[in-house]
């Protein structure tokens, strides 16, 4: 079955700062990994090491949070699909910020992690609300295009095509293949290069 993403709810991590690039999200040395499974430990590892426990990803009040609140131009720098994968392995299921680097945004879509935008003032208020109450419930609704933290509700944005991709589950290419197994078999049977061995034998 395809995985529709209509709403993401949970707790959030406020990560303040503009132009946080992919090398900070996951350093280049982690790109040697054969699979993405071990990338959790590398998420923001250099920043976390330098801050000696003061980084939001290390602070106890933000553990197990699944929404990331960032600022402007998040995910800029070199193109690496490992960056959203590292966030996903950490447990991040959605990101809200002022703006995102285009390739990072696309890589997030490919793994089912919506990146929604909001005005600078709204993002700042969201970060402050979560910092004041890390246990607050945060909801990102792709159907109503709203974010809610407690009594605070604000508009969010995401391209209509991308929004539709999440709501319908079209982002999930593997899920679509599984859901349409019979059609895949029928199509494959008609392809000459798939049945070449049978034709040669006959």
UniProtKB/Swiss-Prot annotation:
One of its GO terms (molecular function) is 3-isopropylmalate dehydratase activity. InterPro entries: 3-IsopropMal_deHydase_ssu, Aconitase/3IPM_dehydase_swvl, AconitaseA/IPMdHydase_ssu_swvl, IPMI_Swivel, LeuD. It holds the Pfam family Aconitase_C. The keyword Amino-acid biosynthesis applies. It catalyses: (2R,3S)-3-isopropylmalate = (2S)-2-isopropylmalate. Its EC number is 4.2.1.33. It is an enzyme of class 4 (lyase). One of its GO terms (biological process) is L-leucine biosynthetic process. Pathway: Amino-acid biosynthesis; L-leucine biosynthesis; L-leucine from 3-methyl-2-oxobutanoate: step 2/4. Keywords: Amino-acid biosynthesis, Branched-chain amino acid biosynthesis, Leucine biosynthesis, Lyase. GO terms for cellular component: 3-isopropylmalate dehydratase complex. The keyword Amino-acid biosynthesis applies. Catalyzes the isomerization between 2-isopropylmalate and 3-isopropylmalate, via the formation of 2-isopropylmaleate. Belongs to the LeuD family. LeuD type 1 subfamily. Heterodimer of LeuC and LeuD. NCBIfam families: leuD, PRK01641.1. This is 3-isopropylmalate dehydratase small subunit. The lineage of its organism: Bacteria, Bacillati, Cyanobacteriota, Cyanophyceae, Nostocales. The gene is leuD.
């Amino acid at each position: 079955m395809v995985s529709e993403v209509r709403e993401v709810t949970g707790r959030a991590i406020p990560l303040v700062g503009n132009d946080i690039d992919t090398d900070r999200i996951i350093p280049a040395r982690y790109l040697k990994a054969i699979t993405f499974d071990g990338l959790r430990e590398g998420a923001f590892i250099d920043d976390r090491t330098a801050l000696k426990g003061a980084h939001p990803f290390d602070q106890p009040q933000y553990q197990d949070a699944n929404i990331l609140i960032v600022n402007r131009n998040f995910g800029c720098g070199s193109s690496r699909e490992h960056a959203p994968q590292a966030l996903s392995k950490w447990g991040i299921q959605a990101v809200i910020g002022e703006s995102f680097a285009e390739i990072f945004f696309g890589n997030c879509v490919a793994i089912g992690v919506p990146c929604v935008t909001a005005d600078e003032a709204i993002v700042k208020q969201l970060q402050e609300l979560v910092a004041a109450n890390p246990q607050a419930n945060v909801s990102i609704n792709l159907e109503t295009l709203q974010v809610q933290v407690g009594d605070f509700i604000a508009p969010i944005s995401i391209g209509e095509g991308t929004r539709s991709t999440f709501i319908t589950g079209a982002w999930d290419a593997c899920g679509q293949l599984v859901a349409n197994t019979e059609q895949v078999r029928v199509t494959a049977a008609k392809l000459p290069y798939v049945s070449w061995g049978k034709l040669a034998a006959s």
